[in-house]
């Protein structure tokens, strides 16, 4: 058996709803033993502070800057992650010395790939001190220094998972993660690896529900299921410059905006935005070298019934099959956190986190900043 490291991955995504935690044992290459996972929701108050921090982040010109609320927010965010780790270890009956490394994503507050600028708040050194566990953080920056988009980083993990797909799933396979922003990873039958952000995921739907005072998201897609797609609005989204041309890029929260209040009713708006999220995946997949036969879907968006219905219908028109990651033997909620654990081990081993075909970097690039308690 190869030398395995126990790693915890911590992910706080663009939906800003909480922290996903996952434990795995891996050699950073092909051997992956997926263990436990959990999540910790942010309070409404802290979520509001994060959203306010996004406004302050617009002033950042250098990635070390922390204007306005961001310095204190970074400190408090890190302490919440430390609490999440302590609680998780207690639940699993583990001690800090039994964990080799934490992969710490932090919270993205600004992502401008065209300016080679990406900012994830989160103090890796503080997290290491608070948990007593070595930490690898800031994993996107090195990719940008080599001309990459800084995202997506999960494809290296998807490639390892692709080697263990259930029998009967036909390739080429695309792993789709539907978070606030959706991204896809194409694994060709020849092992080719291609990845990029595919468009808005839950982000617009969540914002639409909040705009109307109906909570933070559309549980199960129930609101969308009672509405109809407004084709003119959907067409406007899908004609966005992001989808044009062959050059793929990563997205920031500000690249797409919700319709004005009153432009659509609540249900039709939710259904239209669910359709847009699904259609964006298929539209982005049209840039791949071969049409996918299977889409393996993870992330919170797979729990939106309307979005999944639209995605399934669109994929079936192209002869493709859509499957929930849970039904493919994976954990659709924990996959990103698992990826961050896996990437932390790869970082410690000096292995690439990104490739020219996944982020546009000029060569395979490792990355991450390691810190000890």
From Swiss-Prot:
UniProt keyword annotations, A-Z: ATP-binding, Carbohydrate metabolism, Kinase, Nucleotide-binding, Transferase
SUPFAM superfamilies (UniProt xref): Actin-like ATPase domain (SSF53067)
Gene3D superfamilies: 3.30.420.40
HAMAP family: AnhMurNAc_kinase
Residues that coordinate or bind ATP: 13-20
Function text: Catalyzes the specific phosphorylation of 1,6-anhydro-N-acetylmuramic acid (anhMurNAc) with the simultaneous cleavage of the 1,6-anhydro ring, generating MurNAc-6-P. Is required for the utilization of anhMurNAc either imported from the medium or derived from its own cell wall murein, and thus plays a role in cell wall recycling.
Catalytic activity as recorded in UniProt: 1,6-anhydro-N-acetyl-beta-muramate + ATP + H2O = N-acetyl-D-muramate 6-phosphate + ADP + H(+)
Organism field: Brucella suis (strain ATCC 23445 / NCTC 10510)
GO molecular function term, any single one: kinase activity
The organism's place on the tree of life at top rank: Bacteria
PANTHER family found in the cross-reference section: ANHYDRO-N-ACETYLMURAMIC ACID KINASE
GO biological process, one term: peptidoglycan turnover
The protein's name: Anhydro-N-acetylmuramic acid kinase
